[in-house]
A protein has these predicted regions:
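Short, Asp-centered acidic motifs that coordinate Mg2+ and/or phosphate
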Residues: 31, 64, 144
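Acidic-histidine catalytic/liganding microenvironments
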Residues: 24, 44, 59-60, 124
Length: 162
């Protein structure tokens, strides 16, 4: 059984990660970092909920840490998890700069741990189709591709991430 700690319990955690973690029998979501323990316990009554990753890692020996927090926290939280000998799956963007990313890759290698960036749409049909068209040369010599995706909403909401 792979003991898993989920950092954050918002849209990404509950939509992209938790369904897989709950479905696959080799994973057990034992610890969650969230500011809303009542929301977590309604979905995962067996999970222990903490307000900080530092606090949870002092108490629990987990195998995997899944990071679904705001972007600026990804790097520091991945580092902390690796320093506690955990495998890490982190939402995109991995880090805010390449130096931090390279340091984390080196740390993971030195700890002999897996460090993976999660791209939730990597294997979606639309992206696979574009990849195939490019590989087949049907779109010519592409120099740049710009793509926008707004969750199928005709009008974007007024939020800091959007």
């Amino acid at each position: 059984m792979i003991s898993t700690l989920l950092v954050g319990f918002g849209f990404s955690a509950t939509t992209f990660h938790l369904p897989f973690l709950n479905y696959l029998p080799q994973f057990s979501v034992d610890v969650v970092i969230s500011s809303k323990p009542d929301v977590v316990n309604a979905v995962l009554p067996h999970a222990e909920v903490y307000g900080s990753l530092e606090e949870a890692l002092k108490i629990h020996d987990v195998d995997l840490v899944v990071i679904t927090t705001p972007n600026h926290l990804h790097g520091p939280q991945a580092k902390l998890a690796l320093e506690h000998s955990c495998h890490v799956l982190v939402e995109k963007p991995f880090t805010l700069d390449s130096e931090e990313a390279e340091a984390l890759v080196e740390l993971a290698h030195s700890q002999n741990k897996q460090l993976c960036v999660y791209h939730n749409r990597r294997f979606d049909g639309d992206f696979l189709t574009i990849k195939q068209l490019i590989n087949d040369g049907k779109l010519g010599d592409i120099k740049r591709l710009e793509s926008r995706f707004d969750r199928f909403r005709p009008v974007p909401r007024d939020r800091w991430r959007e």
